[in-house]
């Protein structure tokens, strides 16, 4: 799968939730490996902030990115839409300290993205595949986010509002392609008990019933409720009647929890990579979301080079017989048993190392270790299959080494190991010459790596 960006630019205008300012945000296409960057075009020098978890400086009433004295808030809805629709690279330009709140959901962003279209780029999409359970908890609030291994990204949010009229809810998104219809229209919400402190803090100047669901879930005095109704410019209501205060009906009964899921995706966008895993978020909020995103970035840095996923129960893309049709190598020099994944620019091969390998007779009889040069040879054979797979009549061509660079051996390979070869093209095949980067894994660990240049030559 390839990285994606927008086919063109688009602009949205509206007021800021907290500042009440009239704001404009423009979404622009960006080059490969650019990621999400946000630019304050109203400030001298037009500073740019990378949209990553470490740059979050506040999570009290939304996600606020910062760099020095520069701040950009309420970014989560825009990033949620980009991330869910598979956009990897985008430059967002805003003319103020926050994004416009629009209708309190992500639906306007989704509509505009779909309107301008999505463009596939050449670079491969760099997924991070979850291999083990990762969990972040806040004992005080009871918030918890857990991510488990899964083949695709899916999310479940569970919220407990501890109210007589709204208690526990959950929302699930098993298929990210359903985001536009099932999650994007869910609006932000606020409790009546929180409105007065927010107003006293000089916030929510742009908040109204057109961009938020207001929940009156705990009874207060009639006098206080009337005062808040006047602030919101809505009709007075009986203080004994709990419920929603809104202009528009709920889109779904669990709209508030769906919006929490929308926010989780927006804060996940700050991880910087698309994720394959199942997220379960209990009582999520921007603070725990950001802690989770930071933890994920630490985990990714620890496994900068990630081993391919291998399920021995799945049938291979190419078995040993098909490999023999492509490669001239035979016993004892055929060093790839099967291919489990192949695409235009990458390939994954497998070799099972047994005690019967002929090279163990001399390397070394008392302590059998696979020679490093044979690991490189096996990597190159895998890369050769990748290159040959891109030409017509591959059986009529052979691959030859031209150069090997950056060879590193990190760990011994011994009988019983299963080797995974991951090889990626560094540049397209030109004039029969290709550059590739290869890794050999045992389990999750890299045991060797190399960069090599090879040439395909037609057989005589």
Residue ranges and their predicted role:
Residues 258-271, 339, 369-394:
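Active-site helix/loop of acyl-thioester processing domains in fatty-acid/polyketide metabolism
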Residues 272-281, 308-317, 383-420, 447, ...:
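Hydrophobic beta-strand-centered segment that forms part of the acyl-chain substrate-binding groove
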Residues 89, 278, 337-341, 406, ...:
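Extracellular/lumenal ectodomain signal focusing on beta-strand-rich modules
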